[in-house]
Amino acid sequence: MAAIKDSLLAQVAEVLPSSGHKVTIVGIGQVGMASAFSILAQNVSKEVCLIDVCADKLQGELMDLQHGSNFLKNPQITASTDFAASANSRLCIVTAGVRQKEGESRLSLVQRNTDILKNIIPKLVEYSPDTILLMVSNPVDIMTYVAWKLSGLPKNRVIGSGTNLDSSRFRFLMSQRLGVAPTSCHGWIIGEHGDSSVPVWSGVNIAGVRLRELNPILGTGEDPEKWNELHKQVVDSAYEVIKLKGYTSWAIGLSTASLASAILRNTSSVAAVSTSVLGEHGIDKDVFLSLPCVLNANGVTSVVKQILTPTEVEQLQKSANIMSDVQAGLKF
């Protein structure tokens, strides 16, 4: 007696092994799963592969997502502890690493997470030599540099999530002060995703109206409205969320999905992501920091030439020097 499938379906062609938009996510902690869920829920990719060393948790997360396939437009979701499962990925997102502790600087994580990447990056590139790497593991700027060194890929195809989230936090806080939607608030945080990040106060605007034209001391210590507190809130916000709930997840997951969308959909959107900044704004260090970049199917194809004030340039160069000093102590 023929199997039901054979009686039901008459095959006329082979099923293609991949959609061509496969995304692999390495690390199924809070950030990895928030990224996976955001990518699936927003239909950024129909093919997601999860990679982790914890087999039981991996299987549980896989089943939990698969059981919701009916509500996610029928994606193909797989999972494995074997990197071979990541083969032919268009985009590899790395969230694996030691979690940041309450009050711990992202930079203090650096060597522990560097050691973890040594076992991840070469394997991803082995199975997907044409992939784009999107680094999310902290400290993300250093980890993006490490991933580039370990991968052998061109710099445009090794990207860090960088200050995309910081800029989103900045715009949200602006929106709360002004009563305007965050998407209508235009402001950028550049440099390090962390304590030495740089708010570009000179460019903050609503509908093209620069706030510094209304208040020339916006963002300075002399400003009676204390707008400079917004940047401090941006820097402190991750620490505050970690203190309250133990980790950050949803915002960084949504940020990651947004970057994945720009790459997979070839949109040439501009986002603040970590990229090589050697030669930008007078930086003479080979480091990765965030600047507004054009993102598409070839990764970072352009860096926006932001017009910065001398103070902002100085702060950005200081951020680069901090990264360079940390990199000098890395052991590969």
Swiss-Prot record:
GO terms for cellular component: cytosol; mitochondrion. It catalyses: (S)-lactate + NAD(+) = pyruvate + NADH + H(+). Pfam families: Ldh_1_C, Ldh_1_N. Pathway: Fermentation; pyruvate fermentation to lactate; (S)-lactate from pyruvate: step 1/1. Transmembrane segments: none annotated. It is an enzyme of class 1 (oxidoreductase). PROSITE patterns: L_LDH (PS00064). GO terms for biological process: glycolytic process; lactate biosynthetic process from pyruvate; lactate catabolic process; lactate metabolic process; NADH metabolic process; pyruvate biosynthetic process; pyruvate catabolic process; pyruvate metabolic process. It is found in: Cytoplasm. CDD domains: LDH_1. One of its GO terms (molecular function) is L-lactate dehydrogenase activity. Its EC number is 1.1.1.27. InterPro entries: L-lactate/malate_DH, L-lactate_DH, L-lactate_DH_AS, Lactate/malate_DH_C, Lactate/malate_DH_N, Lactate_DH/Glyco_Ohase_4_C, NAD(P)-bd_dom_sf. Keywords: Cytoplasm, NAD, Oxidoreductase. NAD(+) binds at residues 29-57, 99, 138. Belongs to the LDH/MDH superfamily. LDH family. This is L-lactate dehydrogenase. The lineage of its organism: Eukaryota, Metazoa, Ecdysozoa, Arthropoda, Hexapoda. The gene is Ldh.
